[in-house]
Amino acid sequence: MGIKIYKPTSPGRRHQTCSSFEEITTSTPEKSLLIKLKKSGGRNALGRVTSRHQGGGHKQKYRIIDFRRDKISIPAKVASIEYDPYRSARIALLHYVDGEKRYILAPLDLKVGDTVLSGPEADIKPGNALPLKAIPLGTIIHNVELKLGKGAQLARSAGTFAQLMAKEGRYSQVKLPSGEVRMVLQDCYATIGQVGNVDHEKVSLGKAGRARWLGKRPKVRGVAMNPVDHPHGGGEGRTSGGRHPVTPWGIPTKGYKTRTNKSTDRFIVKKRTK
């Protein structure tokens, strides 16, 4: 889980860093848990770009991850820690005692040979999944469900974690990585511990080509465009854009809040800080 630094043998190598992958135990994924996903290139069903700066990238196969953790009271042994091209976190292959195999997000300090369990009676140790009502206050958690039975939606990226702050009635208060404190049903499941691969944020791509391998296309600045393409475009020579920053469609950006009000806003106890 360390960071590998290279000697500056070329301009692209000079600032490049990458993960040492020392926690990876196998390079061969479980075939039964792989599916093919077709790349969209950021286009919708009409062929129009709805998400810019996406396209290309290395061919990948999607690993089916168990975000529900619904095999209650059935122990499983960690068979391997693997790389997943679709996410920043590492994944762990579980072999259940009934013969089934599943992938989960690999929490920090989970090792091959460890036993994990789901259910209210599980121990408070990394990798075990419990309902929030069975988790002590102050516990570091990740992979948190928002809706009962839907599967985990919160705190799934490398190095992230949430914290159980309080319990009141049917709801628990969970502090999320953004600083937001939110009420979540006490019957919703969460996994103990912090997501692994905590050094992911220290990785520097070093060159544009490495971003293209990941399916990321260039982001062209509005001031470098023509007036027909962007509100900041045009002008003689270099310009500042001449107005407060806006999107290509004229909506204020860079700090302007565009989040719409939702019926679930009543579950937010404290707004996000970052």
Curated annotation (Swiss-Prot):
The keyword Ribonucleoprotein applies. It comes from the Bacteria. Residues 223-258 are annotated as: Disordered. GO terms for molecular function: rRNA binding; structural constituent of ribosome; transferase activity. Keywords: Ribonucleoprotein, Ribosomal protein, RNA-binding, rRNA-binding. SMART domains: Ribosomal_L2, Ribosomal_L2_C. Pfam families: Ribosomal_L2 (PF00181), Ribosomal_L2_C (PF03947). GO terms for biological process: cytoplasmic translation. GO terms for cellular component: large ribosomal subunit. Coiled coil: none annotated. InterPro entries: NA-bd_OB-fold, Rib_uL2_dom2, Ribosomal_uL2, Ribosomal_uL2_bac/org-type, Ribosomal_uL2_C, Ribosomal_uL2_CS, Ribosomal_uL2_dom3, Ribosomal_uL2_RNA-bd_dom. Belongs to the universal ribosomal protein uL2 family. One of the primary rRNA binding proteins. Required for association of the 30S and 50S subunits to form the 70S ribosome, for tRNA binding and peptide bond formation. It has been suggested to have peptidyltransferase activity; this is somewhat controversial. Makes several contacts with the 16S rRNA in the 70S ribosome. Part of the 50S ribosomal subunit. Forms a bridge to the 30S subunit in the 70S ribosome. This is Large ribosomal subunit protein uL2. It comes from Pelobacter propionicus (strain DSM 2379 / NBRC 103807 / OttBd1). The lineage of its organism: Bacteria, Pseudomonadati, Thermodesulfobacteriota, Desulfuromonadia, Desulfuromonadales.
